[in-house]
Amino acid sequence: PKGDIMELKRSSGVLLHITSLPANEGIGTLGKPAFEFVNWLKAAGQKYWQVLPIHPTGYADSPYQSPSAFAGNPLLIDLWELVELGLLAPDDIKGREYGEDPSTVDYEKVIAQKKELLRKAFFSFKEDVSYLAFIQEQSWWLEDYALFMAIKQHNELRSWMTWDKELRFRKPEVLAAFKEEHIEDIKFHRFVQYMFFTQWNKLKAYANKNGISIIGDIPIYAAMDSADVWVNPKLFTIDISLRPTLVAGVPPDYFSPTGQLWGNPLYDWDAMERDGYNWWLSRIDHAMKLYDMVRIDHFRAFDTYYAIPADATTAEYGEWKKGPGMKLFDTVREKLGDVNIIAEDLGDIFDSVKKLLSDTGFPGMRVLQFGFNSEGKDSIHLCHNYVNNCVAYTGTHDNDTIMGWLKSADAKAAKMAKSYINANFLEHKNVSFIRSVYASPAALAIIPMQDILGIDGRGRMNVPSTVGGNWTWRMKKPANKKSARLMNKLATAYLRKPSVTANAKDK
């Protein structure tokens, strides 16, 4: 049976990652500006706030390469909340060097300052009942993660694959000895997670109370250098010497002649099935507690996934293998009931992927920017071709902003776009793009904040397959009443505004 996700009501939302919120401490956090953004969303007639993965960032500061599929990102913790709790003094936070430019995140500086301040707060912290309840409730992932991070710290943050053999292979007596010797470091990571989830839960409760639902994001693969792979190597394509045998990526295409080599280990789906898909059930269940709805990245891999030999230097010589398909989602529905999932089904997908999507009943994604390619009016990404059960975007975190794209697109595509959105001199072009997506049959329309603000390519969040300079864009100041009025007007005009009764009912 298909889930009640099919009842996605006509509505709209905004894509803005937490790190992009304005703040004086170099990075957006779960503090006051996040609560103010919820107020802005409400005033703007919106129903959803979509964020990128909120897990700790690892390689190249990407939220899609995390040392944990379950932990929260310490960089998102609001330091001023720690002042209110008496764990820090205002002077501890003020006058530090968090980075010069208020419109970007300087990760190196932010990480150095936050690490020091969180340590300082930890030394003042006294364990209480709610802390003890948290570490008990979350022990199923938290203990492994805290231990993993503590060992990593004592190995100069090097990958676990370079650790001493006994630690790599998780010899119980060696782990027990390490725990005993470094218990304070382990407790520090528990404390940081407690603070993160306390703040996250407070923000989510405030959003829900104000009729705003949060859409999260699950990266499809775990990072090789993660607690998840270190603890569960048998669930991945990892051999007995703990080396990957097959890794993830996508084959060559028009944009990328040698394909994309992501390097994450793949899932051993046979082992996962024997285990009752327990790891994925835990992951989706955890996400459903964190968010109201969740986007699963690279959804096509559940049908067919591309497997590349681990020693390959490009993605040219991989092969397609069969994923778990409906077996996984039937198990999810049986164990967790109906779950609100958005399937990221972008790119060149097989008919079997379309069938899986249809069998699950999950909405897929459409991106207007992709509509102005060589397919002309038949492109599924042009608004008139949208189905009702989909989530439509002007662009995602992997696209240029609308204004950036208009400048860099080839003349033919830009001309087609301007004609399609009926760009005229009465409103800014970014607004015409938003209007087109809002007017479409898509049940849910999500607009990146950069496109609402009409920011050029400097607001781009990520350029796929590049390292460095990504994930850094920030709003210099909070969104204003003028932009809220504009979005409210569009949400009202295109029947996407939540009715007062619907909001009351959702509570």
Question: Whereabouts are the PLM-identified features?
Answer:
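Conserved, well-ordered alpha-helix/loop/beta-strand core segments that scaffold catalytic motifs
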Residues: 189, 193-222
